[in-house]
A protein has these predicted regions:
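Substrate-binding cleft of extracellular glycoside hydrolase catalytic domains
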Residues: 1-25, 29-124, 128-130
Length: 133
């Protein structure tokens, strides 16, 4: 079994030397949401690199209202992954949660199971078509 961490800007300042010393073997970082980069993404990538903590994956928190927006989020995510210098072996996760549904409802869009599946497929198919996992 491996010991990893999942972090986003909500964790604030991270002492990556202390994290590495604690036995953390990999990281999964929030890359962003909508068309916005997580405020700590690049800092966390650099902190992981400086302390030999492999970034095994990133996740994009979705606020898509349709499949086209989900694909656009995938394209945005890939652009940030490339900008960070992460390789094609980086696993890209699609994060569709309650807040995704809540925000959509506030905009008059009801998201159910069918939309969740369609958006997830659109995002993941885009990611895999660009050589990522």
């Amino acid at each position: 079994m491996m010991k990893g961490m999942d972090i986003s800007k909500w964790q604030g300042a991270v002492d990556f030397a202390k994290v590495a010393a604690s036995g953390i073997q990999f990281a999964i970082l929030r890359e962003g949401y909508r068309q916005a980069v997580d405020g700590k993404f690049f800092e966390y990538v650099n902190g992981c690199r400086a302390n030999n903590i492999p970034v095994k994956g990133v996740y994009h928190f979705s606020y898509a209202l349709n499949a086209d927006q989900a694909r656009n989020e995938a394209a945005f995510c890939i652009a940030q992954v490339e900008k960070a210098g992460l390789g094609k072996d980086t696993v890209i996760f699609y994060d569709f949660e309650y807040d995704t549904v809540k925000q959509a409802k506030e905009k008059g869009v009801n998201l159910g199971k069918n939309e969740s599946v369609a958006f997830t497929k659109a995002f993941c198919e885009y990611v895999t078509s660009h050589g990522y996992k």
